[in-house]
Amino acid sequence: MTKAPSQLRVIPPHVPAHLVFDFDIYADARVGSDVHQTYSAAIADAPDVFWAPQNGGHWMVQRMDAISAIATDPEHFSVREMQIPRVPNPPFFIPLSLDPPENLPYRRAMAPMFGPVAVKAMEPRLRAWAGEIIDAALQKGTFDFMADVAKVFPVSVFMELMGMDLSRLHEFRDLAERFFENQNDAAQIEALSGQILGVMKALIDEKRSTPDDKLMSHFIQADMGGGRTMSEDEILAMSFVLFLGGMDTVTNVTGFAYQQLAQMPDLQARLMADAEGLSGAFADEAVRMFGVVNTPRLVVKDIDLMGVPFREGDMVLNLLPIGSRDDRKFDQPHVLDIDRKKVAHVTFSTGPHLCIGHVLGRAEIKVLTEEWFKRVQSFSLAADKPRPFRTGTVMALEALPVSVNAAS
């Protein structure tokens, strides 16, 4: 029987034996529902940069300085392919699949809708949504925080921002989940990409006929310089990455953070007593500790860096969530400490591909936490309930059953 790509061990001749460390990013048995802690422990004895022979073979980068060096060197490490293992027709994302300076006009087109001023203006609506969603969940007593809160709130925000039909939330959320669940299946990725592009094409057609003040209409009308507007293919490629990011990233950061918070009654009491004063610090620490995106790069020019022979055609995976827990940069990196002095991390990447939505993501977690502790006195993990998870290029907590004591 032919082995699946994840089972075959691929070690090219240029990879030194001392840099080889077995790890399957999609299904490593050492990783559990406390994904970040167990993931870090599983590779603790690996080199700072190591070759994982599974999934076609690729480099993995776990230290913050090394991640930053690769993320800021597009001459050698390109974003034009972002699938591990490599696939024949990789999805094309704008601006993620463009190296600088080609990505810059698109980032400029997006920036006004995601900057601090725009996000601040959204806050009343964020707060209203969060309250409605939490109130509905609390009626159940014991419920799945992921299904009833974390998979609803950020996705609602994204869909409203884009001008999408909120009644299709669960349909669109399911599409995004299946895309990330099948990262090592080229045929599934191609089929699901086609479905997502079909959704976005329909939205483009709708907004051309009936423009509004939402993000899709902004893309259609955006001046890219010299009076040029984006082609439909450009808008589709940009919308594709926003669809995936908006449906999955903040959802899972929030889920992992609340899984940890459910086990910290003392911190819950502090947030209950002063959510408005402490929610910003909680959001900052949640983002540092519970990043979910690992960013691939394709080596396009040979380079020896940090004692590692990167060769053209190699795939590289920057482990952003692990880099943000680098014990050379953070004291007690696996402890959720809202009193920690705010310091730089790489959860949102760095350099030319710093996540455009990082201000909005932080605001969503902050507002949700304030509204949660207006209504919740304490909560805990529901006993003996499984907490399934997903790893890969985007990590996810798929269920988080909790028991809640509502505030009086």
Model-identified regions with their sequence ranges:
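Cytochrome P450
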Residues: 1-408
